[in-house]
């Protein structure tokens, strides 16, 4: 599996730093990944759905730690590039909604 595209949508929130959309092998898209600033630094949160009991369940996620680490490295590298291009995380502008296509 290869991550063939990473699209980063920075946001101005305390812990949430960006929404991310990735494409795998030019043929499968995963939306709504998040870059989160936690107690130990940045990490990637997988897309999740709130359950009736209020807990969250991942909709899609890697099945092993090697794949998760590869995804995290790739996504965070692109997040860093995006910040360097535009400076600090900008407020979301029209046309930059990760849910548009």
From Swiss-Prot:
Pfam families: SpoVG (PF04026). Keywords: Cell cycle, Cell division, Septation. It comes from the Bacteria. Gene3D superfamilies: Stage V sporulation protein G. GO terms for biological process: division septum assembly; sporulation resulting in formation of a cellular spore. InterPro entries: SpoVG, SpoVG_sf. Residues 82-101 are annotated as: Disordered. Belongs to the SpoVG family. Could be involved in septation. This is Putative septation protein SpoVG. It comes from Anaeromyxobacter sp. (strain K). The lineage of its organism: Bacteria, Pseudomonadati, Myxococcota, Myxococcia, Myxococcales. The gene is spoVG.
